[in-house]
Amino acid sequence: MLDREGFRPNVGIVLLNQKNQVFWGKRIRTHSWQFPQGGIDRGETPEQAMIRELHEEVGLLREHIRIVARTRDWLRYEVPDRYIRRDARGFYKGQKQIWFLLQLVGHDWDLNLRATDHPEFDAWRWNDYWVPLDAVVEFKRGVYEIALTELARYLPRNELRNRFLRQGVRPHEQETTFDAVPGANFELPPGGSFEPNPQTSYGLDASGKPHET
């Protein structure tokens, strides 16, 4: 389902634990890490799609989370042509997203990456809310910054000081600097990166629905 401009309606999920650390998932059979996200099916509201995607990707139910906030408007990113399948080029442009900030009220053991027969992730970890955005795949970087910045107002005030980290600026009490790779505040497992899987392409499935492959 695409809008008139070629964007697929989508939801993004920022899931917090009780320490305000954020869930990151490793895409199955790749070294790419990202926030949970997924398309909105026809007839669904963004919240309904978020609850469905949350269960499909990380195994959580509505009772396991508290909805803290959501972005006010759609946030868009365009997918570069080299990641779009040839049969979708010319009319599929990218994703438009509503982002939700969620608080986990359950436990870590409620997370289940095998809740469905088509898992999206094969590993997960908690990390600080802010990460150096030069470590995020380039075409999603702007959306991540806008979403995290808009939703940060709903975090406890002691988390707001970390807003400097997204631009590599260190607060006075912080001695860490950030280069073009994840730094001390964001550790990836060996071999991990935010670069897209070279085999990933964006196109249409058998029903004509845009998807990542």
Curated annotation (Swiss-Prot):
The cofactors required by this protein are: a divalent metal cation
Instruction: Give the Enzyme Commission number.
Output: 3.6.1.-
**Keyword Hydrolase carried by entry:** yes
Q: Enzyme class, one word?
A: hydrolase
| Family matches, as SUPFAM superfamilies | Nudix
As annotated in the record, motif Nudix box runs over: 38-59
InterPro entries documented for this protein:
Nudix_hydrolase, NUDIX_hydrolase-like_dom_sf, NUDIX_hydrolase_CS, NUDIX_hydrolase_dom, RppH
Task: State the residue spans of region: Disordered.
Answer: 185-213
Q: Which NCBIfam families match?
A: PRK00714.1-2 (NF001935), PRK00714.1-4 (NF001937), PRK00714.1-5 (NF001938)
Which protein family is it in?
Answer: Belongs to the Nudix hydrolase family. RppH subfamily.
Task: Please report the name of this protein according to its UniProt entry.
Answer: RNA pyrophosphohydrolase
The species this protein belongs to is: Albidiferax ferrireducens (strain ATCC BAA-621 / DSM 15236 / T118)
